[in-house]
C-alpha cells in the first residue's frame, strides 16, 4: 500500500511539473456543453502558463425536452435560455496536448414558451476533456460535462489561443 501511495505521489508530481505549456489565453466557440447549444468562452491561466485557470462565457440554448437547466412547470412549448458558464480548471500534460479537469456553474435565464415567465436558474457541472492548444493559433477541445441535473453534456470547442 505504501508503494502504491508513493508511486501515485511521484506520478502527480511529474505531471504537475510538466503541465500547462499552453498559452495563457484563448477564445473558443463551444458547441453543446455548458453553453447550451452554442456559446463563446474566454479561457485563461491565473498566472503566466500556470496549470490552474478559469473560463467564462456566454451561451444560448434551445430545448423542447426535459434537458433545461432549471425545472419548468407545465413543460408546454419550447424553452430558450441565455447562460453564463464559469469554471475553474486544471491542465495536465505537456506541449500542445492536455487533459482538462474542472468544475463550474452555469447561471442563466430560461423562458418556456408555454409559461412565458422568465426564470433564473443555475446548474453545477464538472469538466473532463482533451485539449489541443498551440502556444499561438488553433485551439481545440472535446469532452463532456456531467452535471447535477443528470444530463450528460458532450461538447466540442474550436478557438484561437494568443
Q: Can you describe what each PLM-predicted range is?
A:
Residues 16-22:
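Sec/Tat signal peptide C-region and signal peptidase I cleavage site
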Amino acid at each position: 500500500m505504501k508503494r502504491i501511495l508513493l508511486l501515485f505521489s511521484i506520478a502527480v508530481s511529474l505531471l504537475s511539473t510538466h503541465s500547462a505549456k499552453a498559452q495563457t489565453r484563448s477564445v473558443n466557440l463551444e458547441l453543446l456543453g455548458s453553453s447550451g447549444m452554442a456559446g463563446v468562452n474566454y479561457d485563461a491561466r491565473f498566472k503566466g502558463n500556470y496549470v490552474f485557470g478559469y473560463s467564462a462565457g456566454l451561451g444560448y440554448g434551445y430545448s423542447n425536452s426535459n434537458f433545461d437547466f432549471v425545472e419548468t412547470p407545465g413543460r408546454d412549448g419550447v424553452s430558450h435560455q441565455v447562460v453564463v458558464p464559469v469554471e475553474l480548471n486544471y491542465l495536465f500534460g505537456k506541449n500542445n496536448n492536455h487533459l482538462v479537469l474542472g468544475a463550474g456553474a452555469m447561471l442563466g435565464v430560461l423562458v418556456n414558451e408555454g409559461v412565458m415567465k422568465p426564470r433564473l436558474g443555475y446548474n453545477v457541472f464538472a469538466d473532463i476533456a482533451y485539449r489541443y492548444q498551440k502556444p499561438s493559433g488553433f485551439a481545440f477541445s472535446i469532452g463532456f460535462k456531467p452535471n447535477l441535473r443528470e444530463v450528460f453534456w458532450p461538447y466540442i470547442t474550436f478557438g484561437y489561443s494568443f
